């Protein structure tokens, strides 16, 4: 253990950069990538702070964790991990987002109906001393000792040093709602705010209908993102997400290229009903976690198809923004259906911790 005193909050969590494949060099350890809210837990003498990735307190949104972690974690420790909500269908990120609500009564009700868990994967301090200058391998040993008697909702993330097993995790654990695999150098120190780890996520492609756009910032001659749709079994075009990975030159080219599709686009647009009804189903609808963001959009006649790269679905939509790959002028929009997407085999979440 190091002799320096533990740092005070806030602390930026160490981050990960995307890698295409699992590293095959020696000296890496692999962990599941949890799909939740990143959080640091600061256990003081008689209190506890749950700090978000953007350095804000989360205690009021997760009162059940505030109590449980205060009981189970010893004073003087700082633990890095992920807040998740587990359901019979796997991890539920939407349920997490519903916690970010100003009404305390609603938060407390949800804390009973859909209780959260905390999955620990790193240790920044123990026994009142910093561990950030220790190698990852040593921090893991101390973390395992700290959580030897942990009980739900506190969990220790699994770890493997076998690349083949990590590859199996990458494939199988998605069925429980996990987001990929994280690779950490065993010799690495904890570096707040630095992308010192690797994250390997699922990579797939899909052909989608382009049915709208959003402008780039306050410009009306540059596209910020394209709104994507897929047809369901009933023949209804559903909004599934956005793609926004464009250079500035591409943004201006797209504005010119798509201008003809803006003409008379709203008259028979498949998403017009959601606009008129002001429901939460339309691509411009507000949610409690997007208040203040400009979600206005410009409808396009749904006549163009593009291929995008995505990682996985959350419900009926892409979990993250997709990456634009190319136009598919050879494909009719009506052929862009949900049934083209890869179906993930369900995987019991409890088996992840038994891995």
Predicted stretch roles:
Residues 1-355:
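Catalytic cores of nucleic-acid ligases and guanylyltransferases
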């Amino acid at each position: 253990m190091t002799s320096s005193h533990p740092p005070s909050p806030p602390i930026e969590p160490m981050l990960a950069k995307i890698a295409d494949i699992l590293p095959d060099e020696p000296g890496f350890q692999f962990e599941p990538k949890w799909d939740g809210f990143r959080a640091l837990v600061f256990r003081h003498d008689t209190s506890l702070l749950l700090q978000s990735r953007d350095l804000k307190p989360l205690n009021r949104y997760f009162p059940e964790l505030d109590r449980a972690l205060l009981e189970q974690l010893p004073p003087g420790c700082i633990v890095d991990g992920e807040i998740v909500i587990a359901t019979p269908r796997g991890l539920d990120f939407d349920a997490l987002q519903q916690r970010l609500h100003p009404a305390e009564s609603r938060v407390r009700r949800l804390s009973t109906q859909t209780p959260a868990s905390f999955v620990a994967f790193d240790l920044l301090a123990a026994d009142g001393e910093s561990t950030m200058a220790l190698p990852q391998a040593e921090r893991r040993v101390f973390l395992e000792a700290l959580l030897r008697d942990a009980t739900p909702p506190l969990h220790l993330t699994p770890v493997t040093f076998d690349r083949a097993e990590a590859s199996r995790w990458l494939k199988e654990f998605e069925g429980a709602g996990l987001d990929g695999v994280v690779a950490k150098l065993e010799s690495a120190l904890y570096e707040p705010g630095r992308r010192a780890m690797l994250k390997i996520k699922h990579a797939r492609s899909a052909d989608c209908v382009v049915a709208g756009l959003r402008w780039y910032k306050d410009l009306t001659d540059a596209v910020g993102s394209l709104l994507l749709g897929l047809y369901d079994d009933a023949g209804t075009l559903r909004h599934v997400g956005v793609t926004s990975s464009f250079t500035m030159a591409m943004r201006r080219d797209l504005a010119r290229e798509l201008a003809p599709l803006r003409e008379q686009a709203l008259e028979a647009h498949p998403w017009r009903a959601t606009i008129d009804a002001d429901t939460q189903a339309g691509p411009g609808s507000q949610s409690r976690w997007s208040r203040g963001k400009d979600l206005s959009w410009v409808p396009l006649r749904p006549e163009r198809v593009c291929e995008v790269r995505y990682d996985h679905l959350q419900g009926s939509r892409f979990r993250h923004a997709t990456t634009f790959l190319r136009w598919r002028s050879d494909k009719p929009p009506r052929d862009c259906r949900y049934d083209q997407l890869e179906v993930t085999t369900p995987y019991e979440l409890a088996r992840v911790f038994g891995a």
